[in-house]
């Protein structure tokens, strides 16, 4: 075995996926691994770099297509990817990198605001050595929340936003609203 593998962190909005991604990458940095994080270019909510919802920042390379940056990340042992659901080539990239000895850590939503799967992330699950599903706190009743609910009426899947546009909700509150 070449040591390469895929770790997948999934869950709804506000469940701490980006925070967990940063935590894992930092641990590898402490262990002297050469690490890089990648964020989706169109995610400009808080500025440059990778941001958590509680405003912690971590430097990150930006792209909209992962396969375009293969040469730029070849020298790194650990590759962290935030907002993985937005990359159309996430499956091919992760599989290629893991097969070539890289540790790939992906943080992604597992479902849309309509509770439909992000197909690329669903396809990444059977290729991953480790899958963790995080939960958030329901912003209505304060119980465990597994779903993201959009506050507006837009129907497009890719609308990037924070608490101004989305809430984490439990099943009961998702259905009753």
Swiss-Prot record:
Cross-referenced InterPro entries: P-loop_NTPase (IPR027417), Thymidine_kinase (IPR001267), Thymidine_kinase_CS (IPR020633)
Gene Ontology terms for molecular function: ATP binding; metal ion binding; thymidine kinase activity
Positions that bind substrate: 113, 157-161
Catalysed reaction, written as an equation: thymidine + ATP = dTMP + ADP + H(+)
Binding of ATP, residues: 11-18
An individual GO BP term: thymidine metabolic process
Record bears the keyword Transferase: yes
Catalytic machinery residues: 83
The entry's keywords: ATP-binding, Disulfide bond, DNA synthesis, Kinase, Metal-binding, Nucleotide-binding, Transferase, Zinc
Keyword Chaperone: no
Binding site for Zn(2+): 138, 141, 170, 173
Pfam families associated with the record: TK
The EC number(s) this enzyme carries: 2.7.1.21
Family the UniProt entry places it in: Belongs to the thymidine kinase family.
Assembly, per entry: Homotetramer. Two molecules of substrate bind to each enzyme tetramer.
Function description: Phosphorylates thymidine and thymidine analogs, such as azidothymidine (AZT). Part of the salvage pathway for pyrimidine deoxyribonucleotide synthesis.
Name of the molecule in the record: Thymidine kinase
Provenance organism: Raccoon poxvirus (RCN)
Lineage of the species this protein comes from: Viruses, Varidnaviria, Bamfordvirae, Nucleocytoviricota, Pokkesviricetes
Gene: OPG101
